[in-house]
């Protein structure tokens, strides 16, 4: 429960209705308490941190002035919504964020009526809010719809598609878009739009130049009024993004200080009373109010539990490398040997492991902002000219560039390597960030080689294999650390389409893909079963699969992907095509979206940890325990 002595105002707020009982003069104090409570809570639980600190004042002002949940707020991405959750009935549960059965890390419609649209990926808010506004207006409903977009999300093309649609509509939609401009996504925001928005911080200079120009030019009788207007527009276009947004059909206001409560309240009151599409540009500081986060906005984007008095403290001792670390080291080593290699990321330099590469090879490093579609086609263009592009991307974000993968890369059989991080079970970030679909949507793409490593050394070998392969290739690896196998430093490759027999047992064979191999080996040793490290999802090792099928009574496929259309389906299709009849048990992720919980919890729930695999095998073949006669070979 909240400490009412430390947070006397926040303790009185369960819902925005309670917030609205305060006088405007008290909102500054409410915001200060909310910021302090967020620091305390995330310090205990971990979670997304710096973005929420940057929108404290904006969150308070919006819930104070708008009649939420009747008026609807749509938050982009969702990194910044912990303050929103605290003010909308989840204050006393916020310390459970990202935990199993706890508060969701992003807005989730099933969790609260105040979470009007589920998010996790960026740049969807304006489209969703516009759809809401159209639907409401068609019913004669005049409730207010507000989209809050920031943290670099305005750099994505989808946001501009929605802006152009909204601004050109007749009748005009009653929509407010708030651009939370903190010059950050997770890494620093990049691109031409970011530079243009940055000029807006000099708007005071613009105002001075504008007024000075009017006085000088206006005093000259031979200067027509239109010349004064052109002077204004010239400087306006240089310093303020209003020209662009107003050309799209939006009434632009700003920029204003997003931490100035009186200015926010005054401006929002005016905009609330006006009709049509409006855009409010607010300037905020990511990590505002917590000095370590203001100084390291990337490091404090998402954190584990920490002591707010000390900040983040590096853990002593050698750190076990993650798969992301393995990729990072490999990329730099490969770049040293291959001058045609380029590294591409859609705004995920830190998360995807390109920090070192960006420093050592800045001329070959491309952060394209939140533009997954562009990233993939950019790589395709490089490949047509003999380049060796590597696209480092999360599994969940690759979904956004699927057409480009198929149309621009695979159809043309171009030499592009996809390094797919956070594949399979991801964990605390929930359904929006899970990588549980990629094997299914990659396996069906002609020309594409798809690999999944069982350990760190194999990951490095597969990356080298994909780079050397004359065509598109994908290596997908999980979040977190591997099995502890040293990755090495060489650039050796693997024969494409060849797996390996890890354990020779009897009766039943476990055909495991990627990160499930270690658990399969544990079960194989316990029950005396054969274990195959399949390595390749496409092409499958046809000879090995057929040989194993001929030597065993039954097969089990294991993968950290949905069973439907996944790697196990490929094994079944191969056996069916060859006329081989064997009982097959397919183990993998269920036909549902992952909730937020630890990776270990989710693997156990899906039955693809060692205990789950063992239980499933014994349920299907109980004679492995009872000692009853073996199954007769089928077919």
From Swiss-Prot:
Homodimer. Keywords: Isoprene biosynthesis, Magnesium, Metal-binding, Thiamine biosynthesis, Thiamine pyrophosphate, Transferase. It comes from the Bacteria. The keyword Ribosomal protein does not apply. It comes from Stenotrophomonas maltophilia (strain K279a). It is an enzyme of class 2 (transferase). Its cofactor is Mg(2+); thiamine diphosphate. InterPro entries: Dxylulose-5-P_synthase, THDP-binding, Transketo_C/PFOR_II, Transketolase-like_Pyr-bd, Transketolase_BS, Transketolase_C, Transketolase_CS. This is 1-deoxy-D-xylulose-5-phosphate synthase.
């Amino acid at each position: 429960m909240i400490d009412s002595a430390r947070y006397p105002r926040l303790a009185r707020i369960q819902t925005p209705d309670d917030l609205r009982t305060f006088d405007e003069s008290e909102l500054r104090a409410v915001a200060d308490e909310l910021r302090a409570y967020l620091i305390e809570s995330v310090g205990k639980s971990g979670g997304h941190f710096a973005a929420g600190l940057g929108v404290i004042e904006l969150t308070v002002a919006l819930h104070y002035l708008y009649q939420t949940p009747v008026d609807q707020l749509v938050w982009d991405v969702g990194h910044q919504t912990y303050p929103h959750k605290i003010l909308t009935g989840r204050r006393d549960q916020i310390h459970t964020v990202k935990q199993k059965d706890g508060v969701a890390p992003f807005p989730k419609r099933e969790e609260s009526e105040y979470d009007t649209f589920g998010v996790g990926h960026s740049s969807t808010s304006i489209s969703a809010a516009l759809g809401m506004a159209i639907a409401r207006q068609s019913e004669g409903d005049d409730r207010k719809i507000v989209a809050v977009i920031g943290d670099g999300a305005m750099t994505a093309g989808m946001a501009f598609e929605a802006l152009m649609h909204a601004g050109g509509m007749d009748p005009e939609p009653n929509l407010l878009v708030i651009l939370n401009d903190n010059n950050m996504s997770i890494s620093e925001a990049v691109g031409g739009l970011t530079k243009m928005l940055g000029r807006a911080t000099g708007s005071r200079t613009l105002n001075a130049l504008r007024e000075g120009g009017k006085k000088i030019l206006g005093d000259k009788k031979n200067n027509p009024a239109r010349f004064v207007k052109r002077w204004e527009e010239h400087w306006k276009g240089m310093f303020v993004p209003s020209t662009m947004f107003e050309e799209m059909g939006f009434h632009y206001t700003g920029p204003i200080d997003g931490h100035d409560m009186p200015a926010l309240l005054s401006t929002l009151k005016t905009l609330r009373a006006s009709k049509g599409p409006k855009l409010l540009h607010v300037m905020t500081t990511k990590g505002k109010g917590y000095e370590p986060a203001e100084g390291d906005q990337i490091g404090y984007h998402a954190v584990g539990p920490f002591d707010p008095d000390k900040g983040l403290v590096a853990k002593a001792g050698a750190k076990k490398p993650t798969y992301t670390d393995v990729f990072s080291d490999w990329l730099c080593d490969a770049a040293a040997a291959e001058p045609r290699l380029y590294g591409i990321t859609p705004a995920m330099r830190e998360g995807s492991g390109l920090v070192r590469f960006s420093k050592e090879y800045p001329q070959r490093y491309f952060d394209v902002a939140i533009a997954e579609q562009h990233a993939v086609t950019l790589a395709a263009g490089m490949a047509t000219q003999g380049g060796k592009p590597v696209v480092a991307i999360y599994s969940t974000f690759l979904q956004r560039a699927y057409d480009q993968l198929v149309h621009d890369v695979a159809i043309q059989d171009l030499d592009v390597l996809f390094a797919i991080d956070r594949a399979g079970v991801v964990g605390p970030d929930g359904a929006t960030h899970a990588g549980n679909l990629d094997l299914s949507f990659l396996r069906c793409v002609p020309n594409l080689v798809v690999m999944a490593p069982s350990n760190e050394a194999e990951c490095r070998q597969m990356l080298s294999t994909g780079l050397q392969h004359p065509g598109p290739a994908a290596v997908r690896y999980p979040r977190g650390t591997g099995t502890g196998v040293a990755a090495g430093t060489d650039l050796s490759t693997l024969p494409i389409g060849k797996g390996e027999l890890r354990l020779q047992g009897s009766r039943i064979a476990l055909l495991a893909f990627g990160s499930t191999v270690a658990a399969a080996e544990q079960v194989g040793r316990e029950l005396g079963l054969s274990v195959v490290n399949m390595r390749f999802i496409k092409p499958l090792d046809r000879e090995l699969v057929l040989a194993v099928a001929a030597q065993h009574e039954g097969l089990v496929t294991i993968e950290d992907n949905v069973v439907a259309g996944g790697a196990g389906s490929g094994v079944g299709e191969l056996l069916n095509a060859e006329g081989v009849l064997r009982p097959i048990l397919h183990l993998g992720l269920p036909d549902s979206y992952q909730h937020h919980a630890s990776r270990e919890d989710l693997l156990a729930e899906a039955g693809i940890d060692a205990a789950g695999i063992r239980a499933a095998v014994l349920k299907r073949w109980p004679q492995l325990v009872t000692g009853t006669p073996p199954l007769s070979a089928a077919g």
